């Protein structure tokens, strides 16, 4: 499942509980994942970097988030998971700074799921400064501090960098996972996506240790 760059209307489709994750051996280049060309640099070459491309405004990202959170908790210490908010449309671009603002205030871990719930369950899209300030205050963040950080040069720079990364990775839709700057997974059922990620993490781990 994904929110496509070229379609801002969510196309929800269910694959059904009968569809289980693909066997690891069945996951192949060009079918279950694609090779990123050119390969992208990672921030920590000694680690296995996994990037989630997402938006708080994406309904599929909302559904994927708890599964990804559980998956992250199971990873070994050599895996580093990072997240990049995309700006595929005006709404996504408008709320992209929210991720980096919460990161700066130290409230990201506490309020990440709350943002998704606010937008998708409560119907508050946080689409204007007033609603975002009220939301921040309601959730224990000083509204002025929140607003100042949201509009800061630092956050704007991080959002620009996120846009550059999204373009470099040629992300067609969200949610999407990139593994170590080499492999991209998108457009699959969520459990299938994570099963493919497991396979690719193991592949990269073997490559880094000199095994085939």
Language-model-detected regions and their locations in the chain:
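Extracytoplasmic thiol/disulfide redox context detector
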Residues: 2-90, 163, 167, 205-212
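Glycine-rich, flexible loop/turn motifs
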Residues: 29-32, 122, 146
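Solvent-exposed, acidic/flexible segments
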Residues: 46-47, 57-65, 88-95, 104-108, ...
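C-terminal cap of thioredoxin/glutaredoxin-like
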Residues: 55, 138-212
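Sec/Tat-exported extracytoplasmic proteins
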Residues: 57, 68, 72-75, 102-106, ...
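Extracytoplasmic/secreted envelope proteins and their assembly/folding machinery
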Residues: 65-72, 95-99, 112, 129, ...
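Structural microenvironment flanking redox-active thiols in thiol-disulfide oxidoreductases
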Residues: 74-105, 110-136
């Amino acid at each position: 499942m994904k929110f496509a760059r070229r379609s801002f209307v969510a196309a929800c489709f269910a694959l059904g509980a009968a569809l289980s994750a693909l066997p690891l051996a069945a996951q192949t280049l060009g079918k279950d994942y694609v090779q990123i060309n050119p390969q992208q640099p990672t921030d920590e070459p000694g680690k296995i970097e996994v990037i989630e491309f997402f938006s708080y405004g994406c309904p599929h990202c909302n559904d994927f988030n708890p599964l990804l959170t559980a998956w992250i908790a199971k990873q070994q210490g050599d895996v580093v998971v990072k997240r990049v908010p995309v700006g595929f449309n005006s709404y996504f671009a408008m709320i992209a700074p929210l991720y980096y603002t919460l990161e700066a205030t130290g409230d990201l871990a506490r309020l990440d799921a709350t943002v998704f719930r606010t937008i998708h369950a409560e119907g508050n899209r946080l689409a204007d400064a007033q609603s975002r300030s009220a939301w921040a205050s309601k959730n224990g963040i000083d509204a002025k501090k929140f607003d100042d950080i949201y509009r800061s040069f630092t956050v704007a720079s991080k959002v620009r960098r996120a846009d550059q990364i999204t373009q470099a990775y040629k992300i067609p839709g969200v949610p999407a996972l990139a593994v170590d700057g080499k492999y991209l997974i998108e457009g699959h059922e969520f459990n299938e996506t994570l099963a493919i990620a497991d396979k690719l993490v193991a592949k990269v781990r073997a490559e880094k240790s000199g095994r085939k």
